[in-house]
Amino acid sequence: LPDNEKAQNESEEVTGEEEDSASKIDTSITIGTESRIAVVSKATDGEYWKLVRQGMEDAVKDINKAYEFSSDDEISMTFEGPSDEQDIETQVNTLDAVIAENPTVLCMSASDIESCQAQLEAASENGIPVVVFDSNVSDDELVAAFRGTDNAYAGKLAAEKIVDAIGENGKIAVFSAQEKTESSQKRVEGFKEALADYEGISIVSELYTDKVKDMSEAMADVLRRYPDLDGVFCTNEDVADMYLGLDKGENTPVMVGVDATSVQQKAI
């Protein structure tokens, strides 16, 4: 199609999708006008987190449309967080600032399973419900709801896919996001538990981004030390994309990644 016709068709498709999703919202649930949703993410950069933000913004638009809120009554949303998932201090400081503004609800994804305890308690004391997404916290009694992947199952599925590819014997490396993140912990646990059924498979290296100075160089070093490596499990977008960007030479072990970025899809 000519560009102008293609753009028009795409616009109509998007509009139709928005109308459908808005019509599915149960408006019998009471929502206060001018409600403020504060989102503090593990990170703001990266394809995965940009998609998370887009999904949240679309949901807010759908709610405002379904409830027919006027411009003065509309629900609003802010989306903040560090640019890097490993910047735990910035996330904690952002949570402090956001809670001080007393939002209607706080949504967060925890970079460190333990680091946000004081902030969760402060939110609870101020009557601010907390919804956690992607990566949970240790004290879920302070959490109203959690929405995320079954991370242990994701790890199990990754192990099964590698076994399908390499058979029941081989050497595996695990390249993971920060060890203190709940999603990373569960994915690695699920992966290891699934591989425990195969005596001929060994995990020869286990790296975490918060345990090495340069993750890219650390992964490259593993490939040099184990030229006969059979498989690699990368637990999130950042690590998977970083690994795919390495010069692996003739050594091309099977790789399974999480988050399905465009880089991973292109590699497949």
Regions found by a protein language model. Name each.
Residues 1-268:
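A residue-level marker of the well-folded mature domains of exported/periplasmic proteins
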